[in-house]
Every structure is written in C-alpha cells, then in structure tokens.
C-alpha cells in the first residue's frame, strides 16, 4: 500500500546504497568489475585522494 512516489524513492535509495559495497569492493580490489566500470573510476579517484 505504498504510494508510487514513495516506491520510486525507496528504489532510488536502495540502488544508491547498493553501490556503496561495490565501491568498497573495488577499492580493496576484490571485485574489479562493477557497474560497467563507473564505480571503479570513482573508487580510483577516491583512493588517489586518500
């Protein structure tokens, strides 16, 4: 019984939080292929800044 807008919001929140473990994996080199390479690029930038 969730309104459509609320469902979409939850889906967006879910997908963005699902990307966090992927980034952590990429940074620790456990999973080099995630999100078509987009996450890897972000993670590499973050690692260099660290």
Curated annotation (Swiss-Prot):
Q: Which region ranges are annotated with the description Disordered?
A: 28-50
Q: Where is the composition biased (Polar residues)?
A: 29-50
Say which domain of life the source belongs to.
Bacteria
Name of the molecule in the record: Uncharacterized protein HI_1524
Provide the taxonomic classification.
Answer: Bacteria, Pseudomonadati, Pseudomonadota, Gammaproteobacteria, Pasteurellales
